[in-house]
Amino acid sequence: GLTVEDELKMLRVIRRIKETAPITVKANFLGAHAVGRAYRGRQSEYVDLVCNEMLPKVAEEGLADFVDVFCDAGFFTVGETARILEKAAEFGIKPKIHANELEVSGGVQVGVKYNALSVDHLEKTTDNEIEALRGSSTMPTMLPGCSFFLGLPYGRAKDYIKAGLPVALASDYN
């Protein structure tokens, strides 16, 4: 993945599955989950590629229900994430965010700002993230399988619940 051709190929396969499977299937565009090898050291050029080539082609073919951006240390910054989400919104592609797996990144707040369906991971969380989600429609999603497999701390699910927030659990299995 992480090239225009590879991302489109994967999403076209998902489209075929959606058309033939007897269950509901949703497609996530994951081109903003890491920077492609050819763009190492040229992060802003890769963000340009996502915004100016990948997302327009994904939208033109109607291939994705969601765009999922990994807003965390070593991946995409809050500013880059916002830029990608703004471009996706132009095409009606709804956002999801992976954030706070490695450090408190600001990804929760950018997810809330852009009305993301969910913010996923949340292994590293402060009270600021919990407060940001209160009153929003963005779903905090814990991925305990990822924590277990990578030896990371588990998210503060109880604190989210005590704050009156719903919490979703997911596998992060891909």
Task: Show where each model-derived region lies.
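Metal-coordinating catalytic core of metallo-dependent amide/deamination hydrolases
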Residues: 1-106
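Active-site-adjacent C-terminal substructures of enzyme catalytic domains
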Residues: 94-95, 103-174
